[in-house]
Amino acid sequence: MSSFSAECWDFSGRKPSFSQTCTRLSRYLKEKGSFGDLSLGMTCKPDVNGGSRQPTMMNLFPCEASGMDSSAGQEDIKPKTMFPRQSSFSSSSSSGTKEDVQMIKETTKSVKPESQSAPLTIFYGGRVMVFDDFSAEKAKEVIDLANKGSAKSFTCFTAEVNNNHSAYSQKEIASSPNPVCSPAKTAAQEPIQPNPASLACELPIARRASLHRFLEKRKDRITSKAPYQIDGSAEASSKPTNPAWLSSR
């Protein structure tokens, strides 16, 4: 081993490479044959007679296990029935269960559902009628009668409306004039309407004429209300003026 440990270092003082370590490991295995005892005392040791003993499981709770074994030897433990079997109605069931079933059926047949009663209020013809302890069956009968009566009244009302409508339509047809002659009469009576395009052209002319009339009236008013008369001044300006000193010469 001393030679092997000494060879682990090179002469130069450097660490060996991976290939060198592998070669040295193979050389060591060839010399020694194995790595030694690596089982750490966990291998099965053979008995004195030469046979190997099978490994046994470690008992973590030895006290409880021994108590369970002793109680199991003394008494047989019976499992509890959490869901007991119900009595079936098959032929294998006992006669007692059949009798019980028949008794239950008879009692259910004999017992009738009690009719529930409550106060009933009816609004009819502008009146209010209140009945105490009115059974549900009678209330249903009253509702059925009301539905039948409402259906009959509705059919009668619709028939009357249809008859009145037909009679009114016949009267209108009889009172109305001949529909063929009416368009000719209306066309003759109605005046001929002018073309809207011609009206649009005539409107500016009428406005222009009315504007001229308005301006003429305003012109007359302006001339009459002026502080001096325009016509007189024009005549005076047209006549020559002869001063007195010119006439003396």
Swiss-Prot record:
Organism: Arabidopsis thaliana
Subunit text: Homo- and heterodimer. Interacts with COI1, MYC2, MYC3, MYC4, AFPH2/NINJA, TIFY10A/JAZ1, TIFY6B/JAZ3, TIFY11A/JAZ5, TIFY11B/JAZ6, TIFY5A/JAZ8, TIFY7/JAZ9, TIFY9/JAZ10, TIFY3A/JAZ11 and TIFY3B/JAZ12. Interacts with RHD6 and RSL1. (Microbial infection) Interacts with the pathogenic Pseudomonas syringae HopZ1a protein.
Ubl conjugation found in the keyword field: yes
Subcellular locations according to the entry: Nucleus
GO function terms (MF aspect): identical protein binding
UniProt PTM: (Microbial infection) Acetylated by Pseudomonas syringae HopZ1a. Ubiquitinated. Targeted for degradation by the SCF(COI1) E3 ubiquitin ligase-proteasome pathway during jasmonate signaling.
Region (Disordered) location: 225-249
Function: Repressor of jasmonate responses. Jasmonoyl-isoleucine (JA-Ile) specifically promotes COI1-TIFY10B/JAZ2 interaction. Activated by MYC2, MYC3 and MYC4 transcription factors. Interacts with and suppresses RHD6 and RSL1 transcription factor activities to negatively regulate jasmonate-stimulated root hair development.
One GO term (biological process): response to wounding
Domain Tify stretches: 113-148
Domain comment, as recorded: The jas domain (204-229) is required for interaction with COI1 and Pseudomonas syringae HopZ1a.
Compositionally biased tracts (Polar residues): 235-249
Matching InterPro entries: CCT_CS, TIFY/JAZ, Tify_dom
Induction info: (Microbial infection) Triggered to degradation by the pathogenic Pseudomonas syringae HopZ1a protein in a COI1-dependent manner, thereby activating host jasmonate signaling.
Motif Nuclear localization signal per UniProt: ranges: 206-213
Recorded superkingdom: Eukaryota
Key words of the record: Acetylation, Jasmonic acid signaling pathway, Nucleus, Plant defense, Transcription, Transcription regulation, Ubl conjugation
Tissue: Expressed in cotyledons, hypocotyls, roots, sepals, petal vascular tissue and stigmas of developing flowers. Expressed in stamen filaments after jasmonic acid treatment.
Protein family according to the UniProt entry: Belongs to the TIFY/JAZ family.
Annotated GO CC locations: nucleus
Motif (Jas): 204-229
Descriptive protein name: Protein TIFY 10B
